[in-house]
Curated annotation (Swiss-Prot):
Organism: Cricetulus griseus (Chinese hamster)
The protein's name: Phosphatidylserine synthase 1
Lumenal compartment residues: 57-72, 124-160, 208-216, 308-309, 377-380
Organism lineage: Eukaryota, Metazoa, Chordata, Craniata, Vertebrata
Single GO cellular component term: endoplasmic reticulum membrane
Molecular functions per Gene Ontology: L-serine-phosphatidylcholine phosphatidyltransferase activity; L-serine-phosphatidylethanolamine phosphatidyltransferase activity
Entry keywords, A to Z: Acetylation, Endoplasmic reticulum, Lipid biosynthesis, Lipid metabolism, Membrane, Phospholipid biosynthesis, Phospholipid metabolism, Phosphoprotein, Transferase, Transmembrane, Transmembrane helix
Record PTM N-acetylalanine, positions in chain: A2
Modified sites of kind Phosphoserine: S417, S440, S452
Enzyme class: transferase
Length: 471
């Protein structure tokens, strides 16, 4: 009996692995102050589900067939999200509430299943489904069929430049601000930005709207819109890194204003992680991981344009911008989980949200290829090969630049994990070194707490206490 029990005992490495994976896949809420919002309500949800199903099944008018199908689909989505709240993992985030991120994961699973379903339809069936969702799509036209691109590029006037600052330029700016908040690296953001412009050049023979004048591509896109967004996002990152996070209970706040501020701050991060994608001793494994990250990022961006070109809907249509918002929501936990997998030796598998995101990206590409065979038959294979080589080359340049910066200026900036954080799995220093690093100096990990405290004492600008910022 004793030997049987002993065989079930987990080793220390297995325990550490499970703890580290759980912190990125099933993050726990610490210091719960209002138990009601975090206590399981399974019986309540079960009762609500049964009662609501009985009510809608026996009281609604089912004389309109199309209305029955539409309401049935919405009900399936709604109750699938309820199951998501009960059964799916939290992911790496807990703010404003883990249930929100469980529903985000549930929506990503639904979208994944929907893409699988599309693969078994023909093009006419997919178009019929789109016309059922929005009859106006019958009259939609491709932007490339009614607009001209890269015309009279030698004519550069102030009026023409100002005319390019439209809603899409605004979207570029804020989109890159959000991307910078997720990636948190100047070098990687600039590399992805420049690589995307190269991607447009290499795929211009398939998508005519990728054609741009040089001043539009270099000055307006890369420098102003993308660069401004990256700068704003990184400024916010640095601000959040400098804060000391201490969250008090609602019960300890006695003023109405303080309670309101604490409630609003519930929608802000519980802590902030300083990330470091590259290290001076980065191995090939980490370089390859960042290269794969950039390829999937570019693929996801390409899917946006191929989907609306093949299935013919405008960029302003809800099918386009709703997908962009949805992809943005699932990208946040995906990047966090992928970074942990790439840099943490104790994390030996990717998180579930990261896995689903990768499958979605490749499934969208497969859907585009299946239903756009006429378009992809014009593909110049040499351009695609050059594109892959350019991404690899820019990844190497990014690595070289970030390593050079770390060697010359890294000593001025001690890395640290999240300020009073509960997620040590993605901090840079570990007792056994970092994944993808051939030799991580153990002396930093032994003094990590002192380095972190000294940095906070020297640079901290504000402190969040009881939900109220104090200078």
């Amino acid at each position: 009996m004793a030997s049987c029990v002993g065989s079930r005992t987990l080793s220390k490495d297995d325990v550490n692995y499970r703890m580290h994976f759980r912190m990125i896949n099933e993050q726990q809420v610490e210091d719960i102050t209002i138990d009601f919002f975090y206590r399981p309500h399974t019986i309540t949800l079960l009762s609500f589900t049964i009662v609501s199903l009985m009510y809608f099944a026996f009281t609604r008018d089912d004389s309109v067939p199309e209305d029955n199908i539409w309401r049935g689909i919405l009900s399936v989505i709604f109750f699938f999200l309820i199951i998501s709240v009960l059964a799916f993992p939290n992911g790496p985030f807990t703010r404003p509430h883990p249930a929100l991120w469980r529903m985000v994961f549930g929506l990503s699973v639904l979208y994944f299943l929907f893409l699988v379903f599309l693969l078994f339809l023909n093009f006419e069936q997919v178009k019929s489904l789109m016309y059922w969702l929005d009859p106006n799509l019958r009259y939609a036209t491709r932007e490339a069929d009614i607009m001209e691109y890269a015309v009279n590029c030698h004519v550069i006037t102030w009026e023409r430049i100002v005319s390019h600052f439209d809603i899409f330029a605004f979207g570029h700016f804020w989109g890159w601000a959000m991307k910078a908040l997720l990636i948190r690296s100047y070098g990687l953001c600039w590399t992805i930005s420049i690589t995307w412009e190269l991607t447009e050049l290499f795929f211009m023979h398939l998508l005519p709207n990728f054609a741009e004048c040089w001043w539009d591509q270099v000055i307006l896109d890369i420098l102003l819109c993308n660069g401004g967004g990256i700068w704003l996002g990184m400024v916010v990152c640095r601000f959040l890194e400098m804060r000391t996070y201490h969250w008090a209970s609602f019960k300890d706040i006695h003023t109405t204003t303080g309670k309101i501020k604490r409630a609003v701050l519930q929608f802000t991060p519980a802590s902030w992680t300083y990330v470091r994608w590259f290290d001076p001793k980065s191995s090939f494994q980490r370089v390859a991981g960042v290269y794969l990250f950039m390829i999937i990022w570019q693929l996801t961006e390409l899917n946006t344009f191929f989907l609306k070109h093949i299935f013919v809907f405008q960029a302003s249509h809800p099918l386009s911008w709703c997908r962009i918002l949805f992809i943005g929501c699932i990208t946040a936990p995906t990047v966090r989980q992928y970074y942990a997998y790439l840099t943490d030796t104790q994390c030996k598998r990717v998180g579930t949200q990261c896995w689903v995101f990768g499958v979605i990206g490749f499934l969208e590409a497969i859907v585009c290829i299946k239903f756009g065979q006429d378009l992809f038959s014009k593909t110049q294979i040499l351009y695609v090969v050059f594109w892959l080589l350019c991404v690899a080359f820019t990844t190497f340049l990014c690595l070289y630049g970030m390593v050079w910066y770390a060697e010359h200026y890294g000593h001025r900036e001690k890395t640290y994990s999240e300020c009073e954080d509960g997620t040590p799995e993605i901090s840079w220093h570990h007792g056994k070194g970092s994944k993808g690093s051939e030799d991580s100096p153990p002396k930093h990990s032994s003094n990590n707490e002192s380095h972190s405290s000294r940095r906070r004492n020297r640079h901290s600008k504000s402190k969040v206490t009881n939900g109220v910022g104090k200078k």
